[in-house]
Amino acid sequence: MDHSRRDFLKKSAVFTLATAGGSLLPEYAAAQLKPKLSELANYDALGLVELIRKKQISPLELVDDVIGRVERVNPRINAVLTKLFDVEKARERAKNGVLEGPFAGVPVMLKNLTQYKDARIDAGSRLYARYIEKKGNPFRTNSPLIDAMERSGMIVAGIANAPELGLLDTTEPVLYGATRNPWNTDHTAGGSSGGSAAAVAAGIVPLAHGTDAGGSIRIPACHCGLFGLKPTRERELGNTHAWSLGMESLNIASELCLSRSVRDAAAFLNVVEKKNIENLPPVGFISGPSKKRLKVALTWETFLGKKPHPEVEKAVRESAQLLESLGHKVDETKMGFDGPEFMDTFLGIFAAFTMQYEARIELLIGGEIKREDALEPWTLGLIEMAKSRGGIQPCSQRAIKVFTEASAAVEKLFKTYDAILSPVMRVPPYKIGWHSPTLDFNTLLTRLLDELGYTPLHNAVGTPAMSAPLYWTSDGLPVGSH
């Protein structure tokens, strides 16, 4: 591997336009687009803003191009839920809206797990879809974060697929079907922001909204060859809504985006960042890398003590070598807390908050529901797990204790190191169906615990974390470094 800065920038997709004759898109996606569409699909969001400012293209033309990309590319990957959004609303805003701000005129996708008044957001759940059919859209306003996105000039051009209630690391909801990885459509795009990731990776949009309560931005970014950042706890504007898991009390959920370039994510964070946060000085807009040389702690083992797949190990080891070639110091170490207890506690708190869904929607609908027809087996299994553990109160109390211990271990590590490097997932992108929500609960649980072993830590302790696209497997599948 050439560890030059040029190679690093190329692999990080910082170059916003492919070199002559080349493409940043998977081959099949580029082949589906007309020449002009394929060329535009190679720009990042800020690159498109520059074209708009130079009047080389209009926002309406961009929206129409996105509609064309959805028509040509989406049937293969099922990233965009065309039934949930009226594209004429996007065309109207592009045509008549006063578009100002750092993302003026850029079409984006919203994850099907947010508060948005102009589309049917059902969280990939048959239960919520039935509620909407009976009661209508519960949202009369956007969340503060979505409002900030629109004030920045972004044009919502569609809704991206997500697993039921955002509860899995793959996007295969029974309600809408599986989202497929643009690099190999037999494989998962990840979850829970899998539709957003696939839409960006396939060149449908340059940027898409995502949420992350256990890895849901970073895992799809890892699997789809994108940049994905989970911000520091409380850093971004809130998005509490009726479909929320209720995890705000533990502050483990964050929101941001999936992007093809680091600079797009930096600009997005600047747009949605809270400007007056106690103990958190503003980040502002980061225009380039720091000159500071870092001490990096490299950790290999999952929470259950397992080593990564050989391709994943190679990906992270090459990232470590790249960091060293750029002047940083990398040491192998261990995290220093009880990994199995942490993972079991994290799973328990997910289960406890999921249990609240059923009662909440029964109350909203005004009657009991037939559970097996309304919720997926994985969701039902989590509800039963929570009941067996006593519900929300004991699970929350345990989480506070265990997460505090994990925070102390991370804080101790940061007294010596500036950053932590690890895999995102223990394995490369697996095939569709391997983590299907319709599998037997214990089978899926075993697979999940075996392969998800790094990302939840940073949700629990509140540290920022990202997946950077620096490696492709011998089979042509992306593997990010964390």
Go through each PLM region and give its residues.
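Gly/Ser-rich catalytic/binding loops embedded in alpha/beta enzyme cores
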Residues: 17, 21, 33-213, 321, ...
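Residue-level signal for inorganic ion chemistry
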Residues: 66, 265, 296, 323, ...
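Acyltransferase
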Residues: 59-64, 308-336, 358-369, 396-417
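Short, surface-exposed loop/helix-turn segments at secondary-structure junctions
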Residues: 430-452
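Short, well-ordered beta-strand elements
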Residues: 253, 257, 477-482
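A short helix-breaking turn/cap at a secondary-structure junction
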Residues: 29-32, 38, 230-319
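N-terminal secretory signal peptides and thylakoid transit peptides that target proteins
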Residues: 1-16
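Short helix-loop capping/hinge segments that flank enzyme active sites or metal/cofactor-binding pockets
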Residues: 103-132, 290-300, 349-411, 423-427, ...
